[in-house]
Amino acid sequence: MSMIKLKKTYLLLIFVFGLSGFAVAQSAARPDIPLVRVYFHEKIDSTQKLIRKLDGKNDEFFKPADNEDLNNRLDKALTERVDSIQDAIESSKIADNNDKIRYLRGLNEALQRFYIGFKYQTVKSPVLLEVVSGYKNCMVLDQKKQSIFPEIKRHSYDAGDILVNAYAFNNNEGLQASKDFLTLKVCHEHPDRMMTILSKNPDFPYTDSLIVVAAHTRPDDLYTYAAAYNKFAERIRNSPDSLVQLIVRISKMPTGRMFFPFLDNLSKNKISFDEVETALKDDEKYYSLLVKTEIDYADRVRRRDTPLSIIALRRKLADKASEVYVNVINGLHESPDNIRFRKIANLSPEELYYLAVMTEDVIYTSSYTHGVYPFIWKKMKTAKGGDSLLLSVKFDYFRKWVKMAANYNTLDDFLKRMDKGNAQILMKAFVNGLEKSATLEDAVDVADSYASINDKAIQSLVMNQVKNNLQQANQTGNKKAENIYDILNTLFLSIDSSNHIDLSEKLGIPPIYFMPNKDMRDAKGRIIIQQFFYGDEDGRTFFPMFINSFRNANWKMQSNNQWVTISSTKGVPVTIYTNKPLDEKQGLDAQAQGALNQYLYDNDLNPTMVIHRGHSYWLPSTLDQLSDSARLVMLGSCGAYQNLSKVLQICPTAQIISSKQTGAGNINQPMINTIIDELRQGKDLNWPVIWKRFGVLFNHGDLFNDYIPPYRNLGAVFIMAYQKEVMNEED
């Protein structure tokens, strides 16, 4: 209902007649609205308009979903049903004006909470249906002086939370019971939020019971809160539960975080505090103890017994693998192998195995191919010890191991180190049961690996196993498995061009075979490109080459102390912003990047192409600064192929060019120049055509063959396709 014209009418009548409390009929079919309540109706109208805009369409409807039926119901709830609640308030027999204002104000608050939640993606669109119907029912109960608790119990946590925080029900007799119910509900449905909620509500009736639950399910969180000095921490410390008390004891120790990975074995007296204390005196002994414990825990997980603090153990194992070993051998990448790999010479095959699988994102290609991988076989008692290695680690992280072997071109060698029958069983296991994982990581590992499998027999075996799993999922009605294996099947078939599969059309995702030039432009028709350089030796070497490649009539340059701006003089307006590779030891390169980021933000310059230049250890810094406006991301660094999922968390539909092994400056630069010049000329980026040209340019060399174009980034495509499928189902 629009109140803008009415407001002007009221002001005119007040001026002419000097009336207060004047009532005007909004229309023949709608109740009269006294002037004293017009403001509250207008606030509701304003919030309705804000919600309509959330779907990104400039119209009078709210249709945020892909499902037309859901869109119609959402739009009807926002307009007709909200209006009918306003009418019901005005036409009700409520005598007290303040009560009517209370309900109008509460309705607006509920809509505003939905608006904020949906805008910042903390609630989904169907919650609006619950909020509108729930508000109406709660209002009826409240008018009758009855508890709203029965109504709140009917709804999801998100809807219930919006309703109980509406001003209208502040004095309802069922408010506290409703809030307690919702607190229990969210703790059950979202255990990751339990400690945060309890810390804010230490007097919650079920706090003591939930503390014990947290000790068994979220021990890491309980450890953090137990070390604090507040009322909730006191409740934790006063718990009589033995496991809670063990966690409290560890939290009080200066080196408690180093003990925490062993919580389960400490609680079962399988290891003593003294044993851990002794290992702590030597980083290498501590790493060995972590590996030994991880294998023990992995065996228990295999037998469906999840140990306490396994997350903390794996986090610490990854930290120590990087800190004590991998960072060292990475840092010596220019030294002879006999010096470089001296640090890992005495490690067991199992300890070397965990160096690999725990440092996927940081280990250099050469650290893996020249060091960790061959050193494992030097330590094994038999050359054909592939299956023995996996048995010794209880098949822990075996999918990650297979994926890395595929990506680093050692999978064929690894599979030959076991009997053919065992190799086939392993690869079937690699593909099976992907739906059982809580995350998509295993499925993405399978997707990433397939194109790197060179053995046609193994590739065929994996393909057939995917088809078998898809058929089984269809027969059993397992929707998650069906989605995973249907997408994998489509991806793997698409690799053979004779199948003529258009992944974008088949999977319902944005184009991956080409990037339209218009999609790279901002509202002013500009293409903004940001490039990250780092101030190490590589950065200082390749930066001048980059600058010199644009010294021609098509470009002009400007420079300050921290960055260079390169702008096109012909064709589409393209501007490249690249920070200077200032001294990384003094942090000057990071300062330059920060200053450039601020400049781009202040001037409303949103990069649609982002280029990372540097080693893989710099990549986390680039990703931390990655703009969510990016449509094309180029990761020309060693190991960058492992970071696709991180990019897609920030830019869900970005196209990605990456290297699965060694990114090379002499390949990066010609690629960058070609792509940018295509954009300057107003051309769409046709990836198959461009990649064919690159193949000729680089003579299909090994370094070039490790670069992955957007339409071959199967892991990235899998994530996009799966997220799209889940969104469609939710709608």
What residue ranges belong to the model's regions?
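Catalytic cores of nucleophile-dependent amide-cleaving enzymes
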Residues: L600-L685
